[in-house]
Structure formats: structure tokens, C-alpha cells
Amino acid sequence: MPEVLAVRAWPLLLSLAVQLGATVGAPQPWRCAPCSAERMALCPPVPASCPELTRSAGCGCCPMCALPLGAACGVATARCARGLSCRALPGEPRPLHALTRGQGACMTTPSDEATDTKDTTSPENVSPESSEITQEQLLDNFHLMAESSEDLPILWNAISNYESLRALEISDVKKWKEPCQRELYKVLDRLAREQQKAGDKLYKFYLPNCNKNGFYHSKQCETSLEGEPGLCWCVYPWSGKRILGSVAVRGDPKCQQYFNLQN
């Protein structure tokens, strides 16, 4: 009887990881790389007018000003001040999508809801069978994953593609014609096993950036938990192989230039 893909409770990839059964063991938490004294020394001074400090978005080490009530917020912005939470605006048809684009707002969190959130959004308390991501879970995990706004489309594409794979049986994987989706499944499988061995020490990894048709976006990037964006490079959409002459950079590698040259 083939196994069925299900969501593992990773704090990094809450809806992306793979439940591989008892052979893998209990899921291990993913955490940012430790903040060394050298990294902390590079932090810019915080303005004296800042009423409240909060952790940096992503895996940055530098403190920053918390966002006040009503401020625009999202997964790649600063965090909301104590007692507030970043929520999609009322009536927003795609609340999670809005948060990935910084279109939420810092709103008051009722005390009873704050207690519930603390109890339920912890990765250890998320059911592996759950296919739903709450706004709180999205923010908790994407704040860790997304070092910059450039990371968000890649991470969101990975979630969207994995959602389309979750209901498929492992025995079907070899039959898939879509190369990027095949690789995404294999990468998630490998990462789940590597994380069990590495514990908290796996700070960089690569997730294939697939389009809705299962092929590759020309821009591919690694995810880094070391406080700075990972490297990005350009690939051929049909194969995922790096384009000859393309250079891996931190930021936008401007992949379209290579296709313009070919045309």
C-alpha cells in the first residue's frame, strides 16, 4: 500500500515538508543560525524614538522598531508591537496571499485569542495531517524563511506546488512528466531526512522554484537561515539546468537578459 504525502510540522516549511512515516522519526525544529558577537556588532543603532524593539524579520540578528497599531505589515516586514498581530484586512478574499505581499495591518489581539495562538501555532502542536495554515502560522514561519521580498514568490510557489502534490501517492511520482515538481518532491524527501541527522545545524537549503505547469521558473534561489539572502541563479525553464554564463548572486540575477540574448 503506497504511502500518502502529508504535511510535516516544520517551523520553516509548515505546509511543504513531507511526512515519511515512522522510519524518519519525530520532526525536528528548524531554527535560524545563532547570532554571533561579530554579527551583532554590525547592527545599526536603533533610533532613540523607537518605543518598542522587536526581533528582525527573517533570520537577521539586528533589533528593529515594532510596528504600531494600523501599520501595514506582512511576512517580510517588521513585526507588530506587543499585543498586536498582523492580519489581513476584513473581507480580504485571499488573506494568506495578502500577507505575503505586505497588505496586512497590525490589529489588536484579544487576550483569549493570544492565548489560543500561543498554544496552537507552535510547530510541535500542529497536526501532521493538517492541510490548513492559519495567518499566525504563516507569519511565524515566513518571518523565519523570507529574508527579503525577493524570496516570497519562490517560497509561495513552493507552497502552491506542494499543495498540488500532497494528495498524490508516492508510487505516482515516477510517472510525473513535470520535471520541477518531481525534483521538489525529491528535495523535500531528502531535506526531511537530512534535518533528522543535522538537527538545528542545517542553515541553507534549496527548494526548486516551480511554475504552475510544473516546470522551472528561470530564477532559482537557495534559502538561508544565516541572516542574509541566499544565492540566486538562472536556469532553463524546461530542464532546471543553470544557464551557461549566468552568475550566482545575492538578489535578482536578471535572468531575462539571457533569453533576450538568445532571441
Curated annotation (Swiss-Prot):
One of its GO terms (cellular component) is Golgi apparatus. Residues 177-255 form the Thyroglobulin type-1 domain. GO terms for biological process: regulation of insulin-like growth factor receptor signaling pathway; response to insulin. It comes from the Eukaryota. The modification Phosphotyrosine is found at residue 162. InterPro entries: Growth_fac_rcpt_cys_sf, IGFBP-like, IGFBP1, IGFBP_1-6_chordata, Insulin_GF-bd_Cys-rich_CS, Thyroglobulin_1, Thyroglobulin_1_sf. Its main location: secreted. Multifunctional protein that plays a critical role in regulating the availability of IGFs such as IGF1 and IGF2 to their receptors and thereby regulates IGF-mediated cellular processes including cell migration, proliferation, differentiation or apoptosis in a cell-type specific manner. Also plays a positive role in cell migration by interacting with integrin ITGA5:ITGB1 through its RGD motif. Mechanistically, binding to integrins leads to activation of focal adhesion kinase/PTK2 and stimulation of the mitogen-activated protein kinase (MAPK) pathway. The gene is IGFBP1. This is Insulin-like growth factor-binding protein 1. It comes from Bos taurus. Pfam families: IGFBP, Thyroglobulin_1. Residues 122-131 have a biased composition (Polar residues). Keywords: Disulfide bond, Growth factor binding, Phosphoprotein, Secreted, Signal. Binds equally well IGF1 and IGF2. Interacts with integrin ITGA5:ITGB1. Interacts with VHL; this interaction inhibits HIF1A degradation. The modification Phosphoserine is found at residues 122, 127, 130, 148, 160, 246.
